[in-house]
Amino acid sequence: MFNAYLDTVLDLSANGTVILAKLPEAYAIFDPIVDVMPIIPVFFLLLAFVWQAAVSFR
């Protein structure tokens, strides 16, 4: 079942590249948010450094 889901999300072409599928039309309004979501963990990493700088790297 997971493999069927993965096949709908990812399209593996003949040369092995991964092409991401588009969101369904009902969720098109969330497209800008989905584009930014992979960057959010980087913000948490940077926040950890800012926090440690604020407490003088104790």
Swiss-Prot record:
CC annotations in GO: chloroplast thylakoid membrane; photosystem II reaction center
Keywords: Chloroplast, Membrane, Photosynthesis, Photosystem II, Plastid, Reaction center, Thylakoid, Transmembrane, Transmembrane helix
Pfam families named in the record: PsbK
Subcellular location, record wording: Plastid, Chloroplast thylakoid membrane
Propeptide section residues: 1-21
Topological relation to the membrane, as annotated: Single-pass membrane protein
Biological process, per Gene Ontology: photosynthesis
Membrane-spanning segments: 29-49
Highest taxon, organism lineage: Eukaryota
Protein family according to the UniProt entry: Belongs to the PsbK family.
Subunit structure: PSII is composed of 1 copy each of membrane proteins PsbA, PsbB, PsbC, PsbD, PsbE, PsbF, PsbH, PsbI, PsbJ, PsbK, PsbL, PsbM, PsbT, PsbX, PsbY, PsbZ, Psb30/Ycf12, at least 3 peripheral proteins of the oxygen-evolving complex and a large number of cofactors. It forms dimeric complexes.
PANTHER family: PHOTOSYSTEM II REACTION CENTER PROTEIN K, PTHR35325
Function: One of the components of the core complex of photosystem II (PSII). PSII is a light-driven water:plastoquinone oxidoreductase that uses light energy to abstract electrons from H(2)O, generating O(2) and a proton gradient subsequently used for ATP formation. It consists of a core antenna complex that captures photons, and an electron transfer chain that converts photonic excitation into a charge separation.
Record-given protein name: Photosystem II reaction center protein K
Gene behind the chain: psbK
